[in-house]
């Protein structure tokens, strides 16, 4: 299957690998791995939970689940299965100027074993089913900035 009309490379993946490899010969590159997708709109789901509460008992249960980050989670194994080909492609890129950032490590298999969280006790990390909220984006940006700092530190 040919994804490139000029025939320069046989597939989109091969084209990506070759171009990133070529660019990385003289430039540092940070590869950002896939961000977990939730599969449903987190904010809408949160609102549904709140609207369906029967006070006061459900409020305590809701608050407890929210505090433990367990209210809305996704299966880490499904994330791994869905992103396997992306990981394989990015992992195939080698070179001294290639660096990696793994946003899923912020959300998956950390707070809750085998699950990817969508919130903590104070923040919601998604604005819909797969786009990070300002807080989620800041967390990912902080990971990227840490990687940039490591790269700069190595350069001195």
Please name every model-derived segment.
Residues 1-156:
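Extracellular glycan-modifying ectodomains
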């Amino acid at each position: 299957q040919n994804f490139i009309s000029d025939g320069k490379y046989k597939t989109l993946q091969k084209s990506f690998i070759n171009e990133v490899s070529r660019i990385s010969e003289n430039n540092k590159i940070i590869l950002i791995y896939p961000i977990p997708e939730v599969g449903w709109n987190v904010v809408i789901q949160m609102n549904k939970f709140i609207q369906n509460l029967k006070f006061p008992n459900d409020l305590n249960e809701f608050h407890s689940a929210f505090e433990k980050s367990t209210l809305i989670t996704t299966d880490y194994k499904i994330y791994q299965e869905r992103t396997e080909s992306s990981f394989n492609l990015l992992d195939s890129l080698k070179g001294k100027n290639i660096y990696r950032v793994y946003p899923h490590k912020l959300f998956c298999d950390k707070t809750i074993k085998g699950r990817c969280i969508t919130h903590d006790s104070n923040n919601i990390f998604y604005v819909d089913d797969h786009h990070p909220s300002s807080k989620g984006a800041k967390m990912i940006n902080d990971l990227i900035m840490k990687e940039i700092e490591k790269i700069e530190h190595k350069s001195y």
